[in-house]
Every structure is written in C-alpha cells, then in structure tokens.
Curated annotation (Swiss-Prot):
Residues 21-95, 104-113 form a propeptide. Residues 1-20 form the signal peptide. Keywords: Disulfide bond, Glycoprotein, Hydrolase, Lysosome, Protease, Signal, Thiol protease, Zymogen. It is an enzyme of class 3 (hydrolase). It catalyses: Hydrolysis of proteins, acting as an aminopeptidase (notably, cleaving Arg-|-Xaa bonds) as well as an endopeptidase. Widely expressed with highest expression found in non-skeletal tissues. Low levels found in skeletal tissue. The active site is at C139, H279, N299. This is Pro-cathepsin H. Its EC number is 3.4.22.16. Disruption phenotype: Mice exhibit markedly abnormal posterior chamber of eyeball with a configuration suggestive of increased axial lengthening, compared to the rounded appearance in wild-type littermates.
C-alpha cells in the first residue's frame, strides 16, 4: 500500500512548545546565555535580546529537568537554543503530502543470524562527513546522498560528495518538494530515471529552492535499483545495514529529540505511523548498550549537534515510526 504522509524537516527545529509566559531569568541563566551567544556568534538588538533570553532560559530549564531524571539519553544546548516552536514552525517547518514508497512491496529477507553490532564508520572510508542542511527542509536530500555516497564507496572504494542541491532543485517530478520536504525513496527513483547525480563541487548547496541546473555530462553517481523495505520490518532494516548498506529512514521528531546530546534516544510522545514522520536520516549501524538495542544514525544538522552529528535511537520498537519508510539504493558502478 501507499501511505500518504507529511514529511517535514528543517535546518533548525523547535526547542520549546511555543510562546511562553514571561520568565524571571536568574543570573546563572544570563551567564550561560551570554556564553552561548559568544560560542554561536549571536548578536541581537536590545528588544530581541530579551526575547531570545526568555527562549533560552525556557529551554535551559527543560534540559536541566530532563537530565536530572532517569532517562536513557541526555540533552544539551545547541545552535537552536534561542528559538521557540512558533518561530521555527513559521520559518523552517513545511508540510507537503508525500507517498511513502517504502510501503509498496514486501522486502525479501533471509533468516539471519546477523552480527550483534555493526558500524559502517569503522569499515573504512565508506561514510561521508556529517553535513548541515541549514534553514531548508531538505533533510531528505542529505539522507539520500549519504546512502548513495556509502553505496558507491562500498562497491567501488571511491568516496564522493554528492549534490543535495540538485535534488532540491530537480526532483519535483518524483513527488519531492525541495525545501518543503520529500522522501529518500523518491529521490533514489529520481536519480535512477534521471541518469545520475552530480558532485557537490559542481552543483553547490545553497539551502534554498532554485532552478534545476543538472548537467548529465557531469553526473558521477548512478542508481541501478531501489530497495524499499517492508513497512514496520525492523528486522529487514537490520539485515540491510548488516549485509549491504546504510539505510535511509524517516521518523517523527518531537521536542525532546531536538535537544539530544548523547545516549539512546527513546520517546513516549511520538507516533509510529507513516503519516506522522517528519525527518529523514541515515542508519549507519546498530548495537546494544546496557541491554538496550539501538540504531546509529547520521543526522544533517551539522557536526556540533548530538554526538558529533550522530545520534542513537532505540531499536526493535519502531521508535517514532522509524521503520515506516526505509530504503536504500543499489548503485551502478
């Protein structure tokens, strides 16, 4: 079946749930805000300063409260800590109807067993560096290029840096919407039928919608086939990551995830259905920590976010719908 879903993704995400009542900000919070401003090279007008300080203090308190409780992951300040939900929703979050082609057909998998852990980052130069999508809902393009970059490197030994901007600008005919969202599975189909994707150096990322400038003579990576993993089949995802390639997937981001810093992310507030997923990422491995199964996931919010741009998320429970729309490309090399 095909599942209609809105895929939202943003270069910056909400860190609070919206406008908040006026807070009495203490000296410690002011000190940390000024340190954070210096770290992130932020400057404000006097009016904006007070507003940003309020947002920061609100998020700071949520982080402190979370970290004092017995959770499987820790939170921390990041580059988005002076923002509210209303602001991010207005500026960065987009919703366009999508069709999750990863639910179209059954993925034929073996019976295992598979290694108890896997990390493609430790298998040589087959995982490209973490990138930053900026203020554009283009997470799906980074998940796509990351998967294909790894596929080409695994098959040929050659590491490329592929052009996310080409996907932003050119893949609309495959039901993608540039900075308004899209799906890796549909982007793989675009590359397959478009006869290739260019390198980033030839088609630089600008983080906004633009006219298509694809030059087929400069295409450097090609897709031979697209593997769409059966809806909610995390065991098939394990097999794919263990034996073949990092896997693109989409899941639902909720407020606590945005402040993730370390540990195994788990949430009781997110949903598990295709219609709720709103961010696309790349599973590059899996493992177990203190009896808790997890995925190793590459994000596209820069290397300063999370664990050097990566995060761990609980595995085996379709956490936040991560098994609702998973796929990977078979490269033509």
């Amino acid at each position: 079946m095909w599942a209609a879903l809105p895929l939202l993704c943003a270069g910056a995400w909400l860190l609070s749930t919206g406008a908040t009542a006026e807070l009495t900000v203490n000296a410690i919070e002011k000190f940390h805000f000024k340190s954070w401003m210096k770290q992130h090279q932020k400057t404000y007008s006097s009016v904006e300063y007070n507003h940003r300080l309020q947002m920061f203090a609100n998020n700071w308190r949520k982080i402190q409260a979370h970290n004092q409780r017995n959770h499987t992951f820790k939170m921390a300040l990041n580059q988005f800590s002076d923002m509210s939900f209303a602001e991010i929703k207005h500026k960065f979050l987009w919703s366009e109807p999508q069709n999750c082609s990863a639910t179209k057909s059954n993925y034929l998998r073996g019976t295992g067993p598979y290694p108890s852990s896997m990390d493609w980052r430790k298998k040589g130069n087959v995982v490209s560096p973490v990138k930053n999508q900026g203020a554009c809902g283009s997470c799906w393009t980074f998940s796509t290029t990351g998967a294909l970059e790894s596929a080409v490197a695994i098959a040929s030994g050659k590491m490329l840096s592929l052009a996310e901007q080409q996907l932003v600008d050119c893949a609309q005919a495959f039901n993608n919407h540039g900075c308004k969202g899209g799906l890796p599975s549909q982007a793989f189909e675009y590359i397959l039928y478009n006869k290739g994707i260019m390198e980033e150096d030839s088609y630089p990322y600008i983080g906004k919608d633009s006219s298509c400038r694809f030059n087929p003579q400069k295409a450097v990576a090609f897709v031979k086939n697209v593997v769409n993993i059966t809806l909610n089949d995390e065991a098939a995802m394990v097999e794919a990551v263990a034996l073949y390639n990092p896997v693109s997937f989409a899941f639902e981001v909720t407020e606590d995830f945005l402040m993730y810093k370390s540990g195994v992310y788990s949430s009781k507030s997110c949903h598990k259905t295709p219609d709720k997923v709103n961010h696309a990422v790349l599973a590059v491995g899996y493992g177990e920590q203190n009896g808790l199964l997890y995925w190793i996931v590459k994000n596209s919010w820069g290397s300063q976010w999370g664990e050097n741009g990566y995060f761990l998320i609980e595995r085996g429970k379709n956490m936040c719908g991560l098994a609702a729309c998973a796929s990977y490309p078979i490269p033509q090399v």
